[in-house]
């Protein structure tokens, strides 16, 4: 690639659609996104050439027609000491404009992703937006949807299944009716998409139990309405041979603004501007995710009949805070101390069986 921007541990390629190619959690060296060691286009995008890896910005159609074409960019120094790189273009189909701002703030481990979707025409136009976030996966990788997720659905909402354990055929595949824990990448024999049905919380995440690290995607679910994953599956060679040489399998954790499905177009009225904000960060050593915000991620897992894991990881340094586990009014566990992106709070706690 002839031109790239290195942005505090992140590599961004304006030359290839503004793709955020990789980002490293500097506390443990974990690649928050799937880092493809090669640029190896294949016939996937709307106009053909498409690469895997990092983050793809999909406006105003999925795998937009310019995802492999140079986009505009600008770096801004902000008054609080943060920096923002803006990426965007006037797209070819409707002559509408999109812009993505990636901001790194002093003392924060998250990337603040600001989106602007602008209809600068006098026409009512259809629009769809999804951030396509890829992560490295293997048999230890788990997709973490919010605990309130009861069902997942397919494209066009024409198949539904229970989550996380499926009990019905899904996308013409009968094996899902056999009690498959669909949160584990290894349990999907074929390529598939699963969308959260009726998103009620503000995050989608993935966790690698082998590397003890993961990726957290946070956004107001009233605006960031969509959450899904796409995978080629363990038996596919698309992601391991066609789209890369040696970088392995990946999964796509996608989050959609103003849309909860694909295709789920909404209308953009003449001269209307729509905006949204994400917060993305790496998590570590906490065994998964059950809840989270831009300030911290939390986990609670039952390890046995009488023990649970309690974990928390913050996005900034706190000299002292308190983590509590309660059952009704009863305090089962409390711990006070420092916490930071590099120092999560993780304990096992005895509970009644």
Describe the predicted segments one by one.
Residues 2-12, 73-75, 115, 267-282:
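Short Pro-Gly-centered flexible turn/kink motifs
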Residues 285-318:
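Surface beta-strand/loop "capping" patches
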Residues 10-27, 87-138, 278:
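Acidic, contiguous internal or C-terminal segments within carbohydrate-active enzymes
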Residues 323-324, 349-353:
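Short, aromatic- and glycine-rich surface loops/edge beta-strands on solvent-exposed regions
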Residues 270-271, 303-305, 340-346:
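Solvent-exposed, conformationally flexible loop/turn segments
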Residues 1, 52-110, 237-266, 270:
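Extended, loop-rich substrate-binding clefts of extracytoplasmic carbohydrate-active enzymes
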Residues 306-337:
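Beta-strand-rich binding/interaction modules
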Residues 15-26, 32, 123-128, 132-273:
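A contiguous, surface-exposed recognition patch within enzymatic or periplasmic domains that forms
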